[in-house]
Amino acid sequence: AGFAGDDAPRAVFPSIVGRPRHTGVMVGMGQKDAYVGDEAQSKRGILTLKYPIEHGIVSNWDDMEKIWHHTFYNELRVAPEEHPVLLTEAPLNPKANREKMTQIMFETFNTPAMYVAIQAVLSLYASGRTTGIVLDSGDGVSHTVPIYEGYALPHAILRLDLAGRDLTDHLMKILTERGYSFTTTAEREIVRDVKEKLSYIALDYEQEIETAKTSSSVEKSYELPDGQVIPIGAERFRCPEVLFQPSMIGMEAAGIHETTYNSIMKCDVDIRKDLYGNIVLSGGTTMFPGIADRMSKEITALAPSSMKIKVVAPPERKYSVWIGGSILASLSTFQQ
């Protein structure tokens, strides 16, 4: 969250609401019945953490309202009734979701004006393009959205319910198989941190597995909050490999490379060349080192042999949806 015209968000925190697992015994400590974002994160040992957004769609409106309240009053420290608001949503979101969002903004927060933009379109804005296909992969959902001259092509948008949270779950499972126990909502956050700090995507998965067996070049170590150090080896690339092989976690879906290709194939034959040449990655789950090269390799294998393929992975892609929103909301034409 932040202000239009800024080049980076002022506040970045996880969409989590945490409630105490135990009853407070210390009188006068000012214990809250709910914690949001980083505060929930830091007290996670005594809380049950809930994510009000599932697969990019809000499933718990009371908690979502808490998060927005926290954003306005504690993070940005603004009065929402004094500022127009730009919110974003996943493509192909149910219409009722957007209506509920609008209702809360106007009725609970009294915002003077609001607009709901599609996330992937904003990422393309941020990359300075008007044509391209965006693969946007966050915590709960991934999408491929082809955009031509600024228009999203709804018939070719594909959605993949596979994203960061699934990778964290997969890593939890791999580590459990190795004898480490991560079960609570708080421990899941530790695993997420392992994933974000150490994972990478192999250019050739089979070959990387062989390398990991014979050499220790892949091994890194991670220190848990209690001081215990665990070695992380092949898990580093086994975890995000799921993006290219969803069957590893029992999903029948196509991987992100194939989904991108399928999305392009649903577009008019005349514009495919422009899409192949502008494949833009966005969202936190595209932050793995090696993802652009692997994506490029996989799509080259699927596309016609003469096709020029370019995968763009802007360094700020974790926040490119926000940056695109900042650009859009500061245009004078938009404000009218």
From Swiss-Prot:
It catalyses: ATP + H2O = ADP + phosphate + H(+). It comes from the Eukaryota. Disulfide bonds: none annotated. Its EC number is 3.6.4.-. The keyword Cell division does not apply. One of its GO terms (molecular function) is hydrolase activity. It is found in: Cytoplasm, Cytoskeleton. The keyword Cytoplasm applies. Keywords: ATP-binding, Cytoplasm, Cytoskeleton, Hydrolase, Nucleotide-binding. GO terms for cellular component: actin cytoskeleton; cytoplasm. Belongs to the actin family. Actins are highly conserved proteins that are involved in various types of cell motility and are ubiquitously expressed in all eukaryotic cells. Essential component of cell cytoskeleton; plays an important role in cytoplasmic streaming, cell shape determination, cell division, organelle movement and extension growth. There are at least 13 actin genes in potato. This is Actin-79. The lineage of its organism: Eukaryota, Viridiplantae, Streptophyta, Embryophyta, Tracheophyta.
